[in-house]
Amino acid sequence: MLHPRARTMLLLSLPAVAIGIASSLILIVVMKIASVLQNLLWQRLPGTLGIAQDSPFWIIAILTLTGIAVGLVIRFSQGHAGPDPACEPLIGAPVPPSALLGLIVALILGLAGGVSLGPEHPIMTVNIALAVAIGARLLPRVNRMEWTILASAGTIGALFGTPVAAALIFSQTLNGSSEVPLWDRLFAPLMAAAAGALTTGLFFHPHFSLPIAHYGKMEMTDILSGAIVAAIAIAAGMVAVWCLPRLHAMMHQMKNPVLVLGIGGFILGILGVMGGPVSLFKGLDEMQQMVANQAFSTSDYFLLAVIKLAALVVAAASGFRGGRIFPAVFVGVALGLMLHEHVPAVPAAITVSCAILGIVLVVTRDGWLSLFMAAVVVPNTTLLPLLCIVMLPAWLLLAGKPMMMVNRPKQQPPHDNV
């Protein structure tokens, strides 16, 4: 016979697995549709018209039209395509299900159109809303917070292809009764995360790791180098933190989302022309291309880091539906490669991983997630102790500093962004 504790944990196991699978399937369908549309917009259509896909005209035109299209969706869809991600944390309160269709359409358009945002925030919003709405009907005794936790865990597992990130994140957020062991509280979320990760793995494998030279042995000087790199990344990120609310307020004085996003798309197009195709989209595939291109110089990496960070701020300030983690990782990779080219004595494994740690820490203010992203992009067990040590001064630098979020106007309800 199972202990009552075990029976309690098993109660939510089946819903957790179902939510994890559903979270992954929603992500897969959205990404597949976005991929097909992206291929149409950036490969087939310019080829048919006899236009180079990397021509300045095409980049500016597609991003401007993408902004107008997303603005129309936000303006006229029911629920106005959900909350503005610039005003929301990664895991937020459930939104009305009526807003989800517009949110999904806005996300797909942004992903396909080359906007420098990832899918994580809108997908998280969709999955939480569906889990809460359906779960409340099927199991009304389970509170909304439980469904929110399961959906967010399943989504994190699906996004990163592993339940490890969910385990790290929720180990610091599940502050339930001290009488209940932590792993009892983690059981159902980890079931959801594992189901999400395994389902994603059946269709595709998220590829984060970069072909960077192996780091052999940690030296004391490497800790100092890593801390300096992380501090540089944090300084760059804090510039974006300062710019985001000010640019958001300035752009949203126009009130009309079609105009705001159209202008935002045009600015993104100009940035895309400056940075080239590698500076577009969410950044994961593009950072692989950046590392593979041996022709990039120190100034090229610096330019890509600045342009991608600027594009991230513009896209978020304009109200595009998307997340900030994936493009921030791209910025970290570009910044790390630039610093390695500038000071070759510091291994690229250190500069890239510590730059990712610093910039993701600014964006998420989550130490575990920052460590995870740095470790999966530069997978080297020798780096783990160094990253844990470098995290300490990085965390001190950010203590009490503003987050990369916009304070929502008091008169604006969470699901209305017109």
From Swiss-Prot:
Disulphides: none
Domain of life: Bacteria
CDD domains assigned: Voltage_gated_ClC
Protein name (record): Putative ion-transport protein YfeO
Alphabetically ordered keywords of this record: Cell membrane, Ion channel, Ion transport, Membrane, Transmembrane, Transmembrane helix, Transport
Keyword ATP-binding attributed: no
Organism: Escherichia coli O17:K52:H18 (strain UMN026 / ExPEC)
Membrane topology of this protein: Multi-pass membrane protein
GO MF annotations in UniProt: chloride transmembrane transporter activity; monoatomic ion channel activity
Homology family: Belongs to the chloride channel (TC 2.A.49) family.
Subcellular location: Cell membrane
GO cellular component: plasma membrane
Membrane-crossing segments per the record: 10-30, 54-74, 99-119, 120-140, 149-169, 186-206, 223-243, 258-278, 300-320, 322-342, 343-363, 371-391
Matching Gene3D superfamilies: Clc chloride channel (1.10.3080.10)
